[in-house]
Amino acid sequence: SVLKREIYDLGYDISKVEDGKVTFIGDADAIARANIFLRTAERVLLKVGEFKATTFTELFDNTKELEWEEFIPKNGKFWVTKANSINSKLFSSSDIQSIVKKAIVERLKVKYAVNWFEEDGNSYPIRVSLMKDVVTISLDTSGDSLHKRGYRPAAGKAPISETLAAALIMLTPWKS
């Protein structure tokens, strides 16, 4: 894939390639560099955990077991921005979002010894993906999609997205 080549060009090794997703291992610098330099990615996600869940109880318990305190500070503002489910027993996006948020709150209540979160600090958007009963929970490090990089605050309708256009150009022999 074009994105795979872009990641290699940044100096990172690919650990997995799937439909619509390329996984690589890197540090905090890699996250920043990926958000700045990847032209064909829609967003850069930091995987917090992956586990199997066929019931909402399993989803809650496994989410609560993840070390959220490593990623979200005591005053962090967090919410589940998106949940999607494909070929999984758990399919209600709103229920998945609610249960994941509740599990994170319960974990952080214990770790930070508080009963209430002000959530007045930095934002930590969370994305949940279920594929064949395997849950992947990630922090969204990009915020808005990467095709909205600030150079054009209001984009008009286009026949293709900027990231797809970048990929098509990268597949041609043309060099800037």
Across the structure, where does each feature detected by a protein language model lie?
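Glycine-rich adenosyl-nucleotide cofactor-binding module
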Residues: 130-176
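Non-catalytic nucleic-acid substrate-recognition regions in nucleic-acid-modifying enzymes
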Residues: 1-124
